[in-house]
Design a protein with these regions (language model features):
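N-terminal low-complexity, Ser/Thr- and acidic-residue-enriched intrinsically disordered segments
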Residues: 1-47
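Glycine-/proline-rich flexible loop or hinge segments
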Residues: 9-15, 46-50, 71-85
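A general "terminal functional-core" signal
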Residues: 67-303
Length: 303
């Protein structure tokens, strides 16, 4: 069975004048339910304050929790922060952390939300409030794990790179469209900047050729995977040209590289944008099911 972490509060009401698809997580949940007995559901707890503040400035954390984020920061995030959004922002990092803990026991687990890689120390950005990847990685590192964050979203994981820079137990990898958001890039442990319009074969070659040596150099205990589907050719905010089959091949490649090294992997959904929310949700679900199928029956080394 595939371990999937989900919380009812992942599905928050839509915000006015926001380009973020608030019903995407509900569609992901419903499609995964259709998979029936192949899914085992887990519900996360809210991430404790100390870990939110381990990644983010305490003043910004308080602004979010108390739903008093300044308008300038809300504009940068892309939607207003009300009490329901603030609650969701605290639960999603708990989901990514729980997925990681489950992966350490089972080989693979997925958070049905998360991947908020643009959130920075003092502010959110790009539809990201708190950086669940950085928060979970810092907590796992404090527990003695070496973590590699692999970010395959079409946008660079700038917030994740900035929040974990210099941490001796955390490394970051980002493969993204060079000319896409954010305009000002951070420095990951390894950045792979791709030209516009790159298709399946060239993308997968670049991914395999760059991620393989990084895995061998960093020797992590766990991979946190940002499995954004916005490299898809028709994505509203993407600049790459991957097909649905190319995305599936991407998941198989990432899974194979992890399995060959005995590494557990926890995934988050990341980005995916367009008018057809159901089609986007299907891509996210295909990623989870593909990763889960790859890890099924694999005996990873004990950690």
């Amino acid at each position: 069975m595939i371990a999937v972490v989900h919380h009812p509060d992942y599905v928050a009401p839509g915000q006015p004048k926001s380009g973020y698809q608030w019903n995407k997580n509900g569609a992901i949940r419903d499609l995964l339910r259709d998979a029936g007995d192949s899914i085992e559901w887990f519900q996360p707890e809210m991430m404790p304050l100390r870990w939110l503040e381990a990644a983010h400035d305490p003043d910004y954390v308080a602004e979010v929790i108390e739903a008093r984020v300044p308008r300038a920061k809300e504009r940068r995030i892309g939607f207003p922060i009300n009490a329901m959004v603030a609650n969701r922002a605290q639960i999603v990092p708990g989901g990514t952390y729980l997925a990681a803990r489950l992966a350490l026991d089972r080989g693979f687990a997925a958070n049905s939300a998360g991947g908020s890689h643009h959130a920075l120390a003092h502010t959110g950005a790009g539809y990201c409030v708190f950086n669940d990847l950085a928060i979970a990685a810092i907590r796992l590192a404090e527990e003695g794990r070496r973590v590699l964050i692999v970010d395959c979203d079409v946008h660079q994981g700038d917030g994740t790179a900035a929040l974990t820079a210099g941490h001796p137990a955390i490394a970051t990898y980002s493969i993204h469209a060079e000319k896409n958001f954010p305009a000002r890039k951070a420095r990951s442990t390894l950045d792979v900047a791709l030209p516009d319009g790159l298709g399946d074969d060239a993308y997968l070659a670049a991914l395999g050729e760059t991620l393989t040596p990084l895995l061998d150099a960093e020797r992590p205990d766990l991979i946190l995977y940002q499995a954004g589907v916005d490299p898809f050719a028709g994505d509203r905010l993407g600049r790459l040209n991957l097909s649905d089959d190319g995305l599936v091949r991407r998941e198989r490649l990432v899974a194979r590289l992890a399995i060959e090294r005995g590494l557990p992997l926890a995934s988050t959904v990341g980005g995916g944008y367009g008018d057809d929310v159901l089609a986007i949700a299907r891509r996210h679900v295909a990623a989870i099911l593909t990763l889960g199928a790859a890890f099924e029956g694999q005996a990873l080394k004990q950690r």
